[in-house]
Structures are given as structure tokens and as C-alpha cells.
Curated annotation (Swiss-Prot):
Protein purpose: Facilitates protein transport into the nucleus. Could be part of a multicomponent system of cytosolic factors that assemble at the pore complex during nuclear import.
Name of one Pfam family that matches: NTF2
Location of the NTF2 domain: 6-119
A GO biological-process term: nucleocytoplasmic transport
Superkingdom of the source species: Eukaryota
Presence of the UniProt keyword Cytoplasm in the record: yes
Name of protein: Nuclear transport factor 2
Keywords: Cytoplasm, Protein transport, Transport
Organism, as annotated: Oryza sativa subsp. japonica
InterPro entries, per the entry: NTF2, NTF2-like_dom_sf, NTF2_dom, Nuclear_transport_factor_2_euk
Intracellular or extracellular location(s): Cytoplasm
Gene that specifies this protein: NTF2
A GO cellular component entry from the record: cytoplasm
Length: 122
């Protein structure tokens, strides 16, 4: 599978899981993984799961507009940049967001080493 196909499959899996079973996202991170969420940093799978689980909405739906990827590093990793919009309820206005993942290979799969998320206002 080429890098673009891996990136698109990861993005589809990540946001489907976020929208339907957010606690299951913890399996995509490791102890050395880092999330920067709106400028706040969280280190390790447990801290990341805690942050994602504490978000102040029960429902969420992501619509993805773009997925771009590049190879990253000699170990076969990749950078994945995502832009799109999300809704936190059926009557809520969509919010634009950008998110970047650095994926690293581990045991025939990939895990999220770095994750940066920002809402885009304006």
C-alpha cells in the first residue's frame, strides 16, 4: 500500500473512531506520543486519552476536506495533514479545523507519535 493510501485509511479510521468510540483512540498512541491540542501539550497515551475523553461534547461528526502526506524519516514514518470541519451536535454550526499527525511504523501497523490539533477561526 502506498503512503497516500495508508494516510487516507488512517484518517478514515481515526475520525470514524473519534466520532463513534472516542475511548478506543488510545490504542493509536504510545507512551512517548504527544498531543498538542489548541496549544496545550499532553504526553503519553493515558494523558492523550484523558484529554480526548474530557472534551465538552458527547457527539461529534467530522467532515474531511483534504488529506496530504509526506514520507518522514528513515524509519518509514509519514506526516499526515488534515483539514475539515466538525459538528458537535445536529444543530451546531460546523467548526473548521486542521490536524497534523506523525505516524511511525510498529509491528506492521502505524501509531501516532505526534498529533497537533487547531480550530481555525475566521
Amino acid at each position: 500500500m502506498d503512503a497516500d493510501a495508508v494516510a487516507k485509511a488512517f484518517v478514515e479510521h481515526y475520525y470514524r473512531t473519534f466520532d463513534t468510540n472516542r475511548p478506543a483512540l488510545v490504542s493509536l498512541y504510545q507512551d512517548g506520543s504527544m498531543l498538542t491540542f489548541e496549544g496545550q501539550q499532553f504526553l503519553g497515551a493515558a494523558a492523550i486519552a484523558g484529554k480526548l475523553g474530557s472534551l465538552p461534547f458527547a457527539q461529534c461528526h467530522h467532515d474531511i476536506n483534504t488529506v496530504d502526506c509526506q514520507p518522514s524519516g528513515p524509519q518509514g514514518g509519514m506526516l499526515v495533514f488534515v483539514s475539515g470541519s466538525l459538528r458537535t451536535g445536529p444543530d451546531e454550526h460546523p467548526l473548521k479545523f486542521s490536524q497534523m499527525f506523525q505516524l511511525l511504523p510498529a509491528g506492521g501497523n502505524f501509531y501516532v507519535q505526534n498529533d497537533m490539533f487547531r480550530l481555525n477561526y475566521g
